[in-house]
């Protein structure tokens, strides 16, 4: 065979020479140069090494299977034949040296066992011969004794008890032969066919395990008759036994204890009561609640169903995780005095932000859109008498929930009332929020520098709301102030700090941070940003925080001026970055130990929120069926709403959903915090909605879709404008009302006949003006008897378009000839009038 070098072999197998030399060295070959010759044996060694290194088996096959198939034909009857095919399969296994050695050992052991068996057999035969000889000798001696015995002895022997005879016979009887021990057979190597055949037979073979003895039952004749015999070829007849259960049915209803959480599905409730789900569904249908097997029930409904079905109910709280979290958050430490949190509330345009600007020496109100506050703002101010934290709330009617959150998170409420305006609706609402939160009120009577200011009117109005001034014997201080010139501001701060001293506000700075989310928004460059007011403990950068259904690690903290801070103590407002979403305003913020616990609680709250929402959605469906029966006929204005902060979004959704009447309604199909994105534009396109952006703008992708599809997208920065535009749109959807204006009345004085028009009424116009081709009514005794159209109007045989009051004319009524003297003809017109909400 032609000799091959390493280089040529590398070209054949398409691999680099260096790699081939490396593999040959790993295989134990001595090749180091590309020009060296490779023999066939070296190739085989290299191939075996490569196969073994890649997990392939290089051994020869150890098993060979031979199959044989023979076909024969059998004649049945005249010309009919049957083909018989016989298949045989044999498998030969090549045994290894270890198996051969084991077989030799088995043969040697078998030979030794055979020799031992032969020896034992010889000993057994000798023992049997000796026993037989002894038995013959005993029988001979017994016969001789019987011949010489007297007749009396025979009688006494006949009267012996049978038991003694049996005992004597048993004693004289030889021992039973012991079963010959056979040498144990040594199993030979088994082929695959034998093992497969044994497995097949083992499936039909009864189990050889020892079973516990069954309790015996006395079978009656009927039982014997009920059984039947089943015989088969080569098998014994077997008598079947009737199946009998081993339990008794309960004689009375079983009362079970049913554990019900805040929500439970119909299937879970049925399982706990040990009844079928169909019975629960049927029972709820009778109660008037059509449900399905997977429907979620609230706790009250499930309790009612379980009690009506006769079971005991155990109400279970699903807040195990929350309670565990509360236990972990308990902290004992030294409490110190903290700064008060003061919320400024009042009616819109009464000067809340201007008052805060004077205190902070800032100019926030100048830069606000529309001159009104639309966000809740948090600031802390260092005064000569100590630090005070202020929350500035919007005064517009739409921000009710925002003001309620401000009252919840505060210690003291400053109620700002304009001296020239008096007590307004939002002033009353602020008083209600403060009383509901149980916080003291300090009234700031603003705009005292105006000539039309009337402080006494303010006192009378607030006294009607149970806010009694100190001068009248109450406990509410009234401080006249002017945010413009600064009159009374120092007295106001002094009154606030005096209230704070009375409250004895304490906090534990060494504890983990705990607070409340004041506001949240989605920043394009920084992600979710939440404004947090720390109420207790210290919040530090790097802490893992939990806010409602959101969690995250605090990546950065900023104060109200946008400067980064490392930590925030009690009563300090900060903005935090790092949450996984924008939390709801008003959510509690807590610092937890690790991310695992935060994620677990957040997911639990998300699932709980979803379950409660589904249960509430289903609860009132049947009750409101008549109210919602005509909902399909309503015209709906769909809106996709995006706002800059969570509080504004909530306020806008509440205000817009409150607009409408029985014919038109507003539906916010999508809402969120942040800019208008491409997905928002697609949602508006799919739902035929209008895109509203409140203090946000659309990105390039969204603008492209809006331009291509011709969507209506509008930007706003004042809440008044968006509400007014939606009202106008709803007014346009209402359509128009048709009103009738009476133009004139003519009294019939005479009736003439005309071959062309039939009856012609000679009339005197008594009121207004009569026009031709206008709808008319014929009144007789002030009762309408005909309604039609004025076809002909003449004066002195001339066709005229109109006839004024005090003039005579002839009137021809189309398709009506029953005109009589004394009738009145009323001419009117129909006018469409725009409707309003």
UniProtKB/Swiss-Prot annotation:
Residues 140-175 have a biased composition (Low complexity). GTP binds at residues 346-353, 392-396, 446-449. Residues 371-375 are annotated as: G2. The keyword RNA-binding does not apply. CDD domains: IF2_eIF5B, IF2_mtIF2_II, mtIF2_IVc. Residues 446-449 are annotated as: G4. Keywords: Cytoplasm, GTP-binding, Initiation factor, Nucleotide-binding, Protein biosynthesis. One of its GO terms (molecular function) is translation initiation factor activity. Residues 392-395 are annotated as: G3. Pfam families: EF-G_D2, GTP_EFTU, IF-2, IF2_assoc, IF2_N. GO terms for cellular component: cytosol. Gene3D superfamilies: P-loop containing nucleotide triphosphate hydrolases (3.40.50.300), Putative DNA-binding domain, N-terminal subdomain of bacterial translation initiation factor IF2 (3.30.56.50), Translation factors (2.40.30.10), Translation initiation factor IF- 2, domain 3 (3.40.50.10050). It is found in: Cytoplasm. Residues 482-484 are annotated as: G5. Residues 346-353 are annotated as: G1. PROSITE patterns: G_TR_2, IF2. Residues 198-208, 230-244 have a biased composition (Basic residues). Residues 97-139, 176-197, 219-229 have a biased composition (Basic and acidic residues). Residues 97-253 are annotated as: Disordered. Residues 337-504 form the tr-type G domain. Belongs to the TRAFAC class translation factor GTPase superfamily. Classic translation factor GTPase family. IF-2 subfamily. NCBIfam families: IF-2, small_GTP. One of the essential components for the initiation of protein synthesis. Protects formylmethionyl-tRNA from spontaneous hydrolysis and promotes its binding to the 30S ribosomal subunits. Also involved in the hydrolysis of GTP during the formation of the 70S ribosomal complex. PANTHER family: TR-TYPE G DOMAIN-CONTAINING PROTEIN, TRANSLATION INITIATION FACTOR IF-2-RELATED. This is Translation initiation factor IF-2. It comes from Stutzerimonas stutzeri (strain A1501).
């Amino acid at each position: 065979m032609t000799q091959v070098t390493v280089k040529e072999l590398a070209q054949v197998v398409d691999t680099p020479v260096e790699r081939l030399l490396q593999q040959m060295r790993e295989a134990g070959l001595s090749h180091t140069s590309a020009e060296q010759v490779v023999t066939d044996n070296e190739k085989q060694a290299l191939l075996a090494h490569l196969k073994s290194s890649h997990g392939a088996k290089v051994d020869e096959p150890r098993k060979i299977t031979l199959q044989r198939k023979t076909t024969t034909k059998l004649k049945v009857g005249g010309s009919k034949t049957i083909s018989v095919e016989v298949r045989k399969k044999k498998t030969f296994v090549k045994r290894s040296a270890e198996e051969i050695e084991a077989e030799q050992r088995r043969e040697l052991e078998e030979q030794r066992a055979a020799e031992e068996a032969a020896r034992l057999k010889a000993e057994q035969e000798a023992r049997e011969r000796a026993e037989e000889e002894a038995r013959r000798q005993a029988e001979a001696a017994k016969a001789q004794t019987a011949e010489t015995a007297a007749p009396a002895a025979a009688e006494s022997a006949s009267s012996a008890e049978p038991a003694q005879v049996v005992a004597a016979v048993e004693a004289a009887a030889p021992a039973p032969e012991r079963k010959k021990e056979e040498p144990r057979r040594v199993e030979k190597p088994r082929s695959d066919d034998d093992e497969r055949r044994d497995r097949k037979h083992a499936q039909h073979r009864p189990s050889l395990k020892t079973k516990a003895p069954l309790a015996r039952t006395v079978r009656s004749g009927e039982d014997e008759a009920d059984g039947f015999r089943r015989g088969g070829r080569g098998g014994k007849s077997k008598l079947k036994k009737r199946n009998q259960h081993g339990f008794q049915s309960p004689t009375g209803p079983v009362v079970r204890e049913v554990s019900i959480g805040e929500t439970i599905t119909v299937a879970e409730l049925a399982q706990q009561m040990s009844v079928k789900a169909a019975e629960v569904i049927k029972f709820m249908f009778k109660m008037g609640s059509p449900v399905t097997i997977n429907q979620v029930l609230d706790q009250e409904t499930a309790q009612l169903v379980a009690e009506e079905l006769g079971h005991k109910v155990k109400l279970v709280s699903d807040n195990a995780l929350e309670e565990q979290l509360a236990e972990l958050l308990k902290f004992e430490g030294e409490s110190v005095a903290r700064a008060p949190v003061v919320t400024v509330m009042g009616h819109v345009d009464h000067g809340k932000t201007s008052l805060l600007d004077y205190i902070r020496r800032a100019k926030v109100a100048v830069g606000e859109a529309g001159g009104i506050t639309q966000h809740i703002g948090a600031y802390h101010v260092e005064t000569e008498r100590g630090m005070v934290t202020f929350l500035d709330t919007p005064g517009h009617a739409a921000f009710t929930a925002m003001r309620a959150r401000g009252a919840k998170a505060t210690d003291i409420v400053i109620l700002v009332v304009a001296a020239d305006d008096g007590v307004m609706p939002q002033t009353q609402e602020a008083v209600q929020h403060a009383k509901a939160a149980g916080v003291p009120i300090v009234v700031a009577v603003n705009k005292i520098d105006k000539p039309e200011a009337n402080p006494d009117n303010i006192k009378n109005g607030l006294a009607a709301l149970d806010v009694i001034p100190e001068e009248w014997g109450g406990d509410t201080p009234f401080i006249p102030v002017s945010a413009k010139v600064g009159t009374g501001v120092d007295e106001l701060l002094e009154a606030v700090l005096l209230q704070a001293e009375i409250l004895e506000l304490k906090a534990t700075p060494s504890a983990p941070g705990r607070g409340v989310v004041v506001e949240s928004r989605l920043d394009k460059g920084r992600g979710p940003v939440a404004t947090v007011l720390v109420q207790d403990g210290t919040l530090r950068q790097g802490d893992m925080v939990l806010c409602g259904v959101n969690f995250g690690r605090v990546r950065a903290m900023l104060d109200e001026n946008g400067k980064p801070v490392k930590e925030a103590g009690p009563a300090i407002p900060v903005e935090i970055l790092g949450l996984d979403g924008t939390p709801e305003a008003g959510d509690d913020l807590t610092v937890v130990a690790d991310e695992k616990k935060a994620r677990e609680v957040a997911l639990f709250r998300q699932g709980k929120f979803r379950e409660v929402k589904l249960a509430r959605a289903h609860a009132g469906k049947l009750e409101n069926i008549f109210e919602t029966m005509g909902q399909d006929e309503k015209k709906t204005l769909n809106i996709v709403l995006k706002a800059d902060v969570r509080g504004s979004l909530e306020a806008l959704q509440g205000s817009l959903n409150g607009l409408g009447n029985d014919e038109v309604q507003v539906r916010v199909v999508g809402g969120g915090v942040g800019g208008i994105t491409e997905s928002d534009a697609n949602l508006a396109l799919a739902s035929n909605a209008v895109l509203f952006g409140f203090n946000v703008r659309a990105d390039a992708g969204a603008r492209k879709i809006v331009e291509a599809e011709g969507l209506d997208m509008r930007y706003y920065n004042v809440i008044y404008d968006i509400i007014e535009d939606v009202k106008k749109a709803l007014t346009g959807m209402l359509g128009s009302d048709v009103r009738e204006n009476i133009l004139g009345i003519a009294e019939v004085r005479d009736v003439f006949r005309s071959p062309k028009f039939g009856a012609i009424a000679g009339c005197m116009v008594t009121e207004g003006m009569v026009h031709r081709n206008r709808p008319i009514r014929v009144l007789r005794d002030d009762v309408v008897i005909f309604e039609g159209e004025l076809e002909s109007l003449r004066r002195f045989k001339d066709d005229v378009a109109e006839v004024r009051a005090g003039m005579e004319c002839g009137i021809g009524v189309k398709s009506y000839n029953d005109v009589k003297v004394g009738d009145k003809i009323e001419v009117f017109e129909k006018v469409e009038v725009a409707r309003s909400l």
